[in-house]
């Protein structure tokens, strides 16, 4: 779910914190991708003409595999170095939210069964998306494919967006790609949404900057976290009657939830045993690994392994799979492809024509020369 209403609130109070762009603008960037969000989108969106998820000849869902394969190829062709982060065990404080989702999914399934029985195809298509969910088996299948493609996969201790944020904070990745805005609350400097949208939707990618949010709002990180808790997060309930604008104004005036509660009108109902402090602690100190010395590795493409898995085991079209592999090979064969291949190298300033002709080698600037440049 993320943070309720945060994107709309930022559009009002911190408009400069969000900018729109295209996927090619991230060429050369290492992006931490919330795998569960991406796979869920493929299960929901990649469907046949009847609205049902794509399956193999044995009736097993394959939408997540085919979607991940082609989307990853597109990212790599755009010069992006993807890192897929998978969910670990959710925190206990999220149990209430997960139970609500389970109940909603069961209701949606009952409505879907009824729509199918009555032959209401349009309603059935809508409900199929609401009942979509990723299983552990599907997650493992995606991991296997990515490993064959040579793409790094990271298993989170807890929730994926927290680990994505940790990778960004450690300088290993530029941004977190997710639809969950709580990646900002967890400390990711940049969060990109609509990152996995298909080209035919023509939706711009939206990038949010945490430092810009704090600068425009005048909030500290702790105050921003308290705002997100008031808006509504996955870890605790909210104060009934306090909407997004009121929440913003309360934090702006009183600086913390503790002070808000001291001055809050009796017309607002505060949840009993409200665990906002525990939620705050989860945002400030999420259960993540230390990535300071962690090395991300993009391995060699296993061409035969991919064919064995996708064509032999999963029964995908061999010609299409081969074309996909060729696209990956073509990208890797282009040595001088800008930031993708020289991402970790230092760019040298070329010599001028006169310097090159005379065989001059540039000297490193002296301390005095450096000081002179600074003054200019």
UniProtKB/Swiss-Prot annotation:
Subcellular location: Nucleus, Nucleolus; Nucleus, Nucleoplasm; Mitochondrion
PTM field: Phosphorylated. Phosphorylation upon DNA damage induces relocalization to the nuclear plasma.
Region (Disordered), start-end ranges: 352-376
Documented EC number(s): 3.1.-.-
GO annotations of cellular component type: mitochondrion; nucleolus; nucleoplasm
Binding site for Mg(2+) 2: 180, 182, 234
List of residues binding Mg(2+) 1: 34, 87, 159, 161
One of the protein's GO biological processes: base-excision repair
Glycoprotein recorded as keyword: no
Keywords linked to the UniProt accession: DNA damage, DNA repair, DNA replication, Endonuclease, Exonuclease, Hydrolase, Magnesium, Metal-binding, Mitochondrion, Nuclease, Nucleus, Phosphoprotein
Family statement drawn from the similarity comment of this UniProt entry: Belongs to the XPG/RAD2 endonuclease family. FEN1 subfamily.
Protein name: Flap endonuclease 1
Gene name as annotated: FEN1
């Amino acid at each position: 779910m993320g943070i309720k209403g945060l994107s709309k609130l930022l559009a009002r109070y911190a408009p400069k914190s969000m900018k729109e762009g295209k996927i090619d603008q991230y060429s050369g960037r290492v992006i931490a991708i919330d795998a569960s969000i991406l796979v869920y989108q493929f299960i929901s969106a990649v469907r046949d003409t009847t609205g049902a998820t794509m399956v193999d000849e044995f009736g097993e869902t394959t939408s997540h595999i085919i979607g991940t394969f082609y989307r990853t190829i597109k990212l790599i062709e755009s010069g992006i170095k993807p890192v897929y982060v998978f969910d670990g065990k959710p925190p206990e404080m999220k149990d209430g939210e997960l139970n609500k989702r389970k109940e909603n999914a069961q209701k949606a399934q009952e409505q879907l069964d009824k729509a199918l029985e009555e032959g209401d195809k349009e309603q059935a298509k809508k409900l199929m998306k609401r009942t979509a969910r990723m299983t552990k088996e599907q997650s493992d299948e995606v991991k296997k494919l990515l490993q064959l493609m040579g793409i790094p996969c990271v298993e989170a201790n807890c929730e994926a967006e927290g680990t994505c944020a940790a990778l960004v904070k450690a300088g290993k990745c530029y941004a977190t790609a997710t639809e969950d805005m709580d990646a900002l609350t967890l400390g990711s400097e940049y969060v990109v949404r609509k990152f996995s949208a298909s080209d035919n939707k023509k939706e711009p990618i939206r990038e949010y900057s945490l430092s810009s949010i704090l600068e425009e709002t005048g909030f500290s990180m702790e105050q921003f976290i308290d705002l997100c808790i008031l808006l509504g997060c996955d870890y605790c309930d909210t104060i009934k009657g306090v909407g997004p604008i009121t929440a913003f104004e309360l934090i702006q005036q009183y600086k913390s939830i503790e002070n808000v509660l001291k001055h809050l009108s009796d017309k607002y109902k505060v949840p009993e045993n409200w665990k906002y402090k525990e939620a705050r602690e989860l945002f400030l100190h999420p259960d993540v690994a230390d990535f300071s010395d962690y090395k991300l590795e993009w391995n060699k493409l296993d061409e035969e392994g991919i064919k064995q898995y996708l064509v032999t085991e999963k029964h995908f079209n061999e010609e299409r799979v081969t074309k996909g592999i060729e696209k990956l090979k073509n990208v890797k064969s282009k040595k001088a492809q800008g930031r993708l291949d020289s991402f970790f190298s230092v760019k040298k300033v070329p010599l001028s024509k006169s310097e090159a002709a005379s065989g001059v080698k540039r000297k490193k600037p002296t301390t005095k020369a450096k000081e002179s440049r600074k003054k200019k």
